[in-house]
Amino acid sequence: MAVPKKRTSMSKKRIRKNLWKKKTYFSIVQSYSLAKSRSFSSGNEHPKPKGFSGQQANK
């Protein structure tokens, strides 16, 4: 017999959303630094992604 699922609490939703945002931010930082290091033209600088503050996180 089918049973309705319990509703996910707002705090759980917020925690999961923040984890997802954090993962995407660090992947953006990593890809930006990789693109910066692999740039073949010396004079051209790649545009920074939106929301990028320039501070790199310690690994």
From Swiss-Prot:
Keywords: Chloroplast, Plastid, Ribonucleoprotein, Ribosomal protein. It holds the Pfam family Ribosomal_L32p. SUPFAM superfamilies: Zn-binding ribosomal proteins. GO terms for cellular component: chloroplast; large ribosomal subunit. GO terms for molecular function: structural constituent of ribosome. It is found in: Plastid, Chloroplast. GO terms for biological process: translation. The keyword Ribonucleoprotein applies. Disulfide bonds: none annotated. Its main location: plastid. It comes from the Eukaryota. Residues 37-59 are annotated as: Disordered. Belongs to the bacterial ribosomal protein bL32 family. This is Large ribosomal subunit protein bL32c. It comes from Sorghum bicolor. The lineage of its organism: Eukaryota, Viridiplantae, Streptophyta, Embryophyta, Tracheophyta. The gene is rpl32.
